[in-house]
Amino acid sequence: MVTSVRTQPPVIMPGMQTEIKTQATNLAANLSAVRESATTTLSGEIKGPQLEDFPALIKQASLDALFKCGKDAEALKEVFTNSNNVAGKKAIMEFAGLFRSALNATSDSPEAKTLLMKVGAEYTAQIIKDGLKEKSAFGPWLPETKKAEAKLENLEKQLLDIIKNNTGGELSKLSTNLVMQEVMPYIASCIEHNFGCTLDPLTRSNLTHLVDKAAAKAVEALDMCHQKLTQEQGTSVGREARHLEMQTLIPLLLRNVFAQIPADKLPDPKIPEPAAGPVPDGGKKAEPTGINININIDSSNHSVDNSKHINNSRSHVDNSQRHIDNSNHDNSRKTIDNSRTFIDNSQRNGESHHSTNSSNVSHSHSRVDSTTHQTETAHSASTGAIDHGIAGKIDVTAHATAEAVTNASSESKDGKVVTSEKGTTGETTSFDEVDGVTSKSIIGKPVQATVHGVDDNKQQSQTAEIVNVKPLASQLAGVENVKTDTLQSDTTVITGNKAGTTDNDNSQTDKTGPFSGLKFKQNSFLSTVPSVTNMHSMHFDARETFLGVIRKALEPDTSTPFPVRRAFDGLRAEILPNDTIKSAALKAQCSDIDKHPELKAKMETLKEVITHHPQKEKLAEIALQFAREAGLTRLKGETDYVLSNVLDGLIGDGSWRAGPAYESYLNKPGVDRVITTVDGLHMQR
């Protein structure tokens, strides 16, 4: 009998819904606060350095800088404040924002600053003359204001020309300077004000990590759209001003760092003094309205019973059974609890009898470490006895770890047979480790085996180091493809002739200058190379993505001495930062590289390392692919010192500077009829 279940009516708490709604739409509330404060920025005073006040402060400072160029700044403020022409006021604020950024960009050039002040004086004179009335030349186009609008367009063109002449044609320097010189310092001042502390220089340099990554990617996508629009349609005061205004919203993208700080770590709040006079209600404080509920989900008490069979559709976790047949050494049903990994060794049959007409290679079970990193060793490999450890580590002796029986007439082309010989060594060695959490492969001590050369019934013994991890990766039936790829790419395979290791280029350590002993991970950068379809997309940033590939390719191998690795990591992080804001700032700094000799020396050092990279040819092919499919070399040359040095290191002859020869995709006939969208390429019909 099924009893009826009645849903309990929701409990309504006064003020709770409002509180939750306010917290859920905090960003929207901040944006609306910015709009409200922007309308009263001339008459009211902003109190306290709050994050949401920054856009209004920038607008106020821009208007003040422009109005100072006029004969009567107070009259200009009055005209602007009392005007009801919304479009006209917006046009003036856009001009003022670009004008103030131009003043900062031309601070080193007295001549450019004089020209700017002249343009500002003429513009403010037009404001006084126009009056910002209903029919204004600053608003929508009207036939009767055609002459005045022509003068304004001429002044806007002069402003853009002055900026281009003093930034090398790169208007993006304005937004970069705004972020590094004003946005980030303002964020630091807000933190210092709210927490009553002083930030050290290292903390200030890491403030960019406070910005939410997803929100930062949205800003980067908008920045790329702005660059493409500028390339296609040219520059305009409105477009550049709106781009600068977008940068002022960065403080609103901060994580809610204040709410995550424990209450006992916050400074004592300032309690206002009570007003003079009688206190109502006998001096009792009024209870606050509304209810604040903090919900904390504690998952520490959750227990997982691995003794039951759990089917996650992609993994099998069964720790209750370990079937081991000691009679024929069959490891076909070893199930290791590795949270998401099921290892099937059914293909590994280490029977004691082998056919002479077939080749059978048997390896001991790999050591698999889970998050506990607890291990146990095997007592006897010959009988197949296994101790049930928490992490499932299995150690075997050297004579049982690698066994290969090969028919010389059918399998061995060079006349060599690899066999295991008892008594070669009695030392216990572990083959390899697979960390189920990080998908990282660690090579244990190599096994010493004996290689017998078969030549006219003469045997010649050689000692070879054999570590074969590729069969292991191919037999991980339940391991995800990503983990398998990582295992095969990051593992160093050691053979008798040292092929396929970082030692295959012995001259590498001799040609890296001060970084003696520097070695790189092999093929680790291949995972960062995007697909051709992605390269053709609208929002693809060819420069940053390519430099990211180079940064990954220059990742030192763990065999590099620690002092050398630490020093090179510092150089790599400085020249190839994993931060778009820092990368743009470095690009702007390198535009006048002669004023920074230390930076130039570091660039030359990194270029020398790239020149002698063991996989330089592969990286050069990737560079040409970026140039061909994504137009990388359109960002080339003297305007981008960092990118040009990297390309010169990879392509020594400098042929990439020719440009169109490599940009075949962008120069195909009819490419102007191709529309590039997020989902691919489409032909115009």
Swiss-Prot record:
Protein name per Swiss-Prot or TrEMBL: Cell invasion protein SipA
Cellular compartment(s): Secreted
Superkingdom classification of source: Bacteria
Biased composition (Polar residues): 338-349, 369-383, 494-511
InterPro entries reported in the protein's UniProt record: SipA_actin-bd_C_sf (IPR023224), SipA_C (IPR054043), SipA_chaperone-bd (IPR023225), SipA_N (IPR015138)
GO function term, MF aspect, one: actin binding
Biased composition (Basic and acidic residues): 315-337
Protein family: Belongs to the SipA/IpaA family.
GO-annotated cellular components: extracellular region
Positions of the UniProt region annotated as Actin-binding and polymerization: 497-669
Composition bias type Low complexity, residue spans: 291-304, 417-429
Region (Disordered): 265-386, 404-432, 494-514
Record Gene3D superfamilies: Salmonella invasion protein A, C-terminal actin-binding domain, SipA N-terminal domain-like
Main localization category: secreted
Keyword terms of this UniProt record: Actin-binding, Secreted, Virulence
Purpose of the protein: Actin-binding protein that interferes with host cell actin cytoskeleton. It stimulates actin polymerization and counteracts F-actin destabilizing proteins. Potentiates SipC activity; both are required for an efficient bacterial internalization.
